[in-house]
């Protein structure tokens, strides 16, 4: 699944979309914690491997998306046309390496990251309203902040790794924008 839009741009934009679970799925918090390991800040796998170790990009991220009944894991990187092929390869490899599991240390950082983001989002009326509206649409009810925090904290390393083994991220839709050839 590949879409290429060739345009004269300063950078090549790379987007990946992997099927994922939505908030109604029992594995939702395991998936969100795995995503936080992948892209939750400067100690995340994407930041460390794609930006710090290899210097392929300035910006790289992954985030949840989707509609009712179908979640998505989206990944993004912006790079030069000369490095687009390698960047795409490394970005895919890091997402797909999640199937090997995460460590206790990574999970601990991910839990802190998600709970911190939850607290920060609660500080914004707009963010909380959007979260409540999304919950109503996706779940038919609004989750309390304490419910979300308890679900994050209650998700074990075994649960995350079992989820990742059962739901490996493979065969993404790939979108490329820029001056790309044979990527």
Question: How would you label these PLM feature ranges?
Answer:
Residues 1-44:
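His/Glu-based metal-binding/catalytic segments typifying zinc-dependent metallopeptidases
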Residues 16, 32-34, 50, 75, ...:
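Buried hydrophobic packing residues in well-ordered domains
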Residues 97, 110, 115-183:
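C-terminal regions of mature proteins
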Residues 7-10, 65-71, 141, 167-168:
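Short, flexible turn/loop "capping" segments at secondary-structure junctions
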Residues 26, 83-87, 182-183:
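Short, conserved charged micro-motifs
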Residues 15-19, 38-79:
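A structural supersecondary motif
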Residues 61, 65-121:
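M16/insulysin-pitrilysin zinc metalloprotease superfamily fold
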């Amino acid at each position: 699944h590949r879409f290429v839009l060739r345009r004269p741009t300063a950078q090549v934009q790379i987007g990946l979309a992997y099927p994922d679970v939505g908030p109604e799925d029992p594995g939702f918090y395991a998936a969100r914690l795995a995503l936080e390991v992948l892209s939750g800040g400067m100690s995340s796998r994407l930041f460390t491997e794609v930006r710090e170790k290899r210097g392929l990009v300035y910006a790289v991220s992954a985030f949840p998306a989707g509609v009712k009944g179908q979640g998505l894991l989206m990944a993004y990187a912006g790079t030069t046309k000369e490095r687009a092929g390698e960047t795409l390869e490394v970005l895919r490899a890091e997402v797909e390496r999640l199937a090997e599991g995460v460590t206790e240390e990574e999970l601990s950082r991910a839990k802190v990251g998600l709970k911190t983001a939850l607290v920060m989002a609660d500080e914004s009326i707009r963010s909380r309203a959007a979260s409540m509206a999304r919950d109503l649409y996706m779940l038919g009810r609004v989750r309390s902040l304490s419910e979300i925090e308890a679900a994050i904290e209650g998700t074990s390393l075994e649960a995350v790794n079992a989820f990742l083994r059962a739901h490996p991220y493979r065969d993404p839709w790939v979108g490329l924008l820029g001056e790309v050839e044979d990527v």
